[in-house]
Design a protein with these regions (language model features):
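Alpha-helical metal-binding/catalytic segments enriched in His/Glu/Asp
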Residues: 1-28
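Predominant activation on well-ordered alpha-helical scaffold segments within soluble catalytic domains
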Residues: 1-6, 41, 45, 113, ...
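Secondary-structure transition/capping motifs at alpha-helix termini
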Residues: 6-15, 50-61, 122-126, 153
Length: 161
C-alpha cells in the first residue's frame, strides 16, 4: 500500500501488485468466481511457488501483504442525515472514505486504517471516515471475506455516493 502510493516503476521495488475483481458480490460472494471462492488464494499461492517460496515463506508473504477492498461508500443523504453518525458522515467530492465497523462488517482495523490514511496523506488526497451507526443495520463488503480466507491485513474504502 505504501509503496503503491509513491511514484515508481516496476523495477524500483520487489513488491508484487495484484488487482482482483470478483463476481456475485451483491448476492453474498459464495461462488467460485466470488470473493469467497478459491481464485485469489490460488493465484497468490501459485505466484509464491513460481518465485520459489515454500509453504512457510508463503505464510510470511501473506503476513507482509496488505489489501485494499474498494467499493462504494454511503454519503450523507440530505433528507436522512440522522442515519449517519454526526461525526462520521461522508460527503460527495471530499475524498475517499475509510470504512470502519465495530461488528466487523468491514475489514478495517487500526493498523490498516493508519497505513491507508498515511498513504492518502503522502499522496495529498483528502480522506474521510465512515463509522457504522450501531442503531442502523449495515451491509458488508468482500473485505472481511478475503481477509478471513487469506489472513491478509485489509482496509475497506469507498468512493462516497
Amino acid at each position: 500500500m505504501i509503496g503503491a502510493a509513491s511514484p515508481s516503476t516496476a523495477s524500483d521495488h520487489k513488491d508484487i501488485l495484484v488487482m482482483a475483481a470478483f463476481d456475485h458480490e451483491e448476492v453474498g460472494s459464495a461462488s467460485r468466481y466470488g470473493a469467497a471462492g478459491p481464485i485469489l488464494g490460488d493465484v497468490l499461492t501459485r505466484t509464491a511457488r513460481a518465485l520459489g517460496a515454500n509453504e512457510e515463506q508463503r505464510f510470511q508473504m501473506f503476513a507482509r501483504s496488505s489489501c485494499v477492498s474498494a467499493d462504494a461508500a454511503h454519503s450523507v443523504h440530505p433528507n436522512f442525515p440522522d442515519k449517519h453518525d454526526p461525526t462520521h458522515h461522508p460527503i460527495i467530492g471530499r475524498g475517499p472514505v475509510t470504512k470502519i465497523n465495530g461488528n466487523q462488517r468491514y475489514a478495517s482495523d487500526a493498523t490498516t486504517v493508519a497505513l491507508w490514511e498515511g498513504a492518502c496523506q503522502r499522496a495529498g488526497v483528502p480522506v474521510q471516515r465512515f463509522v457504522g451507526n450501531n442503531d442502523v443495520p449495515c451491509g458488508s463488503t468482500i473485505g472481511p471475506i478475503s481477509a478471513t480466507r487469506l489472513g491478509i491485513p485489509t482496509v475497506d474504502v469507498g468512493v462516497p455516493m
